């Protein structure tokens, strides 16, 4: 019996083959634009899927929709039904928690012009956390090689499940729904909500999606730094691909700083001109940056801010303009990394 639980040891040759397979898979994924859209089952959260569908508008974009459920959820008594359901997650009569929400995703994607239900599909399952259901995904692949994945993931909590999913990626963009609560930096250091935790810790850019799809335009903020200019470039490409007008904005804290703000937007406009991306408008303002960005940018579909790359402790000590905008904005906010 002791031998039954003994860990399987791979030979050096087998380990090398596994590493090479993973490296090839990651290299292949890096050549594509991959979006991870997270849902929690509420009607409001499906806005993440609509945003993802509109951003993933070409065949070199892949879309993964994730639903994270807590461990177990009382499924221990239904082992046989669970095994049958996970083998054919989208068609089984017995529904795992979250499956109905993933079925709704297919309907929303069809409404957005992506009819993946008729594509060839592959179902995969992995054991996780000793849970009867584990992790299950259904991948739909178009003839052009485009991938739509519906993933049901088991995790101790939603935030850790989402961040763990990134490690299985990588992803270029995560899309989360509007937070139900957002704590100050001090309280968040000890107890942050799901969206706040993921936004703070995610290695890639994060869009916090609010009900702003009916609005138009990307309100892209810059302070003139090289990090900010990289964010301008990335956000502008996304805006250009989705045919959204671009407004460049910079805020100065004093009148003396206004020339620097004007120079920042002028340099950003020149950068985009070199990329053959048109800028609809440039704007500057004097005041507290967060207040100016939130007040002026909330009329647009998306506010774009540059993440400062600060740790939780650094955010506690120094604060974060990007985090404050995400928290206070009345529209969707793209935090670019």
Predicted segments, located by residue:
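Small/aliphatic-rich secondary-structure junction motif
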Residues: 11-14, 21-95, 106, 110, ...
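Gly/Ser-rich helix-loop-strand patches that form or flank binding pockets
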Residues: 1-23, 45-51, 56, 152-214, ...
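Generic structural signal for helix capping and beta-alpha/helix-loop junctions
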Residues: 73, 126, 183, 216, ...
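A short, acidic, amphipathic alpha-helical segment used as a generic capping/interface helix at domain edges
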Residues: 268-270, 286-297
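Conserved beta-strand segments of alpha/beta enzyme cores
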Residues: 147-149, 205, 278-281, 332
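Short, well-ordered alpha-helical microsegments
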Residues: 45, 159, 228, 290-291
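Charged docking surfaces used in two-component/phosphorelay signaling
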Residues: 120-136, 140-161, 285-290
């Amino acid at each position: 019996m002791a031998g039954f639980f003994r860990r399987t040891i791979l030979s050096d040759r087998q380990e090398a083959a596994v590493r090479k397979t993973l490296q090839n898979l990651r290299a292949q994924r890096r050549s594509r634009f991959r979006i991870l859209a997270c849902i929690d089952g509420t009607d409001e959260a499906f806005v993440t899927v609509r945003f993802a569908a509109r951003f993933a508008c070409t065949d070199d974009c892949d879309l993964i929709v994730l639903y994270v459920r807590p461990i177990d959820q009382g499924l221990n008594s239904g082992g046989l039904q669970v095994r049958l359901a996970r083998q054919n997650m989208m068609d089984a009569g017995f529904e795992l928690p979250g499956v109905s929400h993933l079925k709704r995703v297919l309907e929303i994607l069809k409404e957005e012009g992506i009819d993946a239900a008729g594509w060839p599909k592959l179902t995969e399952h992995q054991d996780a956390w000793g849970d009867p259901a584990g992790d299950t995904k259904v991948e739909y692949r178009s003839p052009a090689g485009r991938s739509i994945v519906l993933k049901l993931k088991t995790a101790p909590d939603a935030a850790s499940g989402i961040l763990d999913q990134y490690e299985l990626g990588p992803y270029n963009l995560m899309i989360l729904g509007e937070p139900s609560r957002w704590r100050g930096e001090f309280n968040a250091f000890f107890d942050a909500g799901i969206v706040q935790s993921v936004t703070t810790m995610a290695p890639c850019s994060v869009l916090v999606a609010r009900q702003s799809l009916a609005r138009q335009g990307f309100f892209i903020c810059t302070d003139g730094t090289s990090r900010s200019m990289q964010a301008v470039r990335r956000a502008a490409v996304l805006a250009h691909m989705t045919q959204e007008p671009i407004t460049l904005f910079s805020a100065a804290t004093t009148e003396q700083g206004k020339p620097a703000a004007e120079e920042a937007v002028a340099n950003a406009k020149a950068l985009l001109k070199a990329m053959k991306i048109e800028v609809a408008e440039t704007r500057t303002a004097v005041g507290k940056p967060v207040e100016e960005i939130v007040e002026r940018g909330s009329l647009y579909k998306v506010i774009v801010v540059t993440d400062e790359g600060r740790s939780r402790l650094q955010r506690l000590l120094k604060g974060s303009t990007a985090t404050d905008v995400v928290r206070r904005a009345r529209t969707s906010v793209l935090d670019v990394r």
